């Protein structure tokens, strides 16, 4: 697939056709809905989802132009290139394989068995850790179980997991809090971290430091402040690792900063921040 040339969508012939169709007099839905076969012809199913477009003001000409635009833009070819692991991220010269994180088990995945096996192994690791955390089996330096998790990260390392936590927070009956409280800090200004930690106890707090490269200055600053809080709260410096988890593409660098190997979960460099929710993030 040749990706060296980029043609803007509005420069394509199908786009011009769509613009012409958009300028046509609007047709009311009451005139479209009675058309024979409309409901069946505009219903689609894929990946467990059902889509009914029959109540949109589209017709055969519009659909044909949309399909033509997709073909002219080589959407399918580019999607297949992504699945094969080609470096379609031209800015960073990387693959874009977040789909491997959420792909179902396949005998011959387009991204290769090696990647699937690595993803499966990492999923098993961090799922087991999360389950142990929920069952109060993860302890701090005093032997007390961890009751609070503080997520340190910015961008996709904050927004995705924060959304999931808020969406899935209620227990089965909707009243009882989860066994472990999760807090998020993304502002390098010390006030947000200080406010969060003011209600927590160092012996029962675990920090999850999310950084693909461990070079993000904001995250490193928050991490340094968190370690200082642990030590000031009575945790021996050589025991801080019991209160630290790293999610990163650079586990060796994380370990050089004090994280233990078993508490480093892998985030591949082919996972973009906005898609990292499907990883250990």
Where are these regions (language model features)?
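Extended, charge-enriched "interface" segments that sit outside catalytic cores
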Residues: 6-34, 38-142, 147
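Expand to "…catalyze enediolate/carbanion chemistry for C-C bond making/breaking, isomerization
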Residues: 2
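Glycine-rich phosphate-binding loops that contact phosphosugars or nucleotide phosphates
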Residues: 128-136, 142-281
